[in-house]
């Protein structure tokens, strides 16, 4: 088991969140794809496996503890960047109807490729938040932003 899987499994067990082998493999693949794309388009400063697991994946999953996300909820991640927190949430909660919005097309291209490779069903939108906010279908979606760290 790799450091990513070990770190994720330990956190999941401590927080009573079920993670199976398929989900752990998706996190492994996500980290690999993230690092590969990061060399081309600078998605993150965090590239060490354990840091990716803790600072990207686990931080994203803290949303599950902070919010009661109903089954089949529709979620839009505005300014999704490299897909945090939305893609880790979708890996753990496949029932979520996920939309990811970002203003940079290169990040949308990354997210489309990532979702294809991970077998994740999600919608991506290349738009600025203020423009998408004028579009009625998106007004009713839940907005979850990445938890911030206190320094």
Each model region followed by its residue ranges:
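Ser/Thr-centric signal marking residues that sit
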Residues: 44-47, 80, 99, 148
């Amino acid at each position: 088991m790799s450091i990513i899987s070990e770190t994720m499994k330990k956190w999941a067990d401590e927080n009573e969140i079920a993670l199976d082998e398929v989900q752990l493999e998706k996190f492994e693949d996500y980290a690999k794809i993230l690092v590969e794309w990061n060399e081309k388009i600078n998605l993150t400063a965090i590239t060490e496996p354990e840091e990716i697991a803790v600072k990207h994946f686990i931080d994203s999953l803290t949303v599950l503890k902070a919010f009661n996300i109903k089954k089949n909820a529709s979620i839009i991640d505005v300014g999704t960047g490299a897909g945090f927190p939305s893609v880790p949430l979708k890996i753990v909660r496949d029932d979520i109807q996920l939309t990811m919005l970002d203003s940079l097309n290169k990040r949308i291209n990354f997210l489309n490729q990532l979702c294809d490779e991970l077998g994740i069903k999600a919608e991506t939108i290349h738009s600025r938040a203020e423009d998408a906010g004028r579009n009625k279908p998106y007004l009713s979606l839940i907005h979850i932003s990445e938890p911030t760290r206190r320094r």
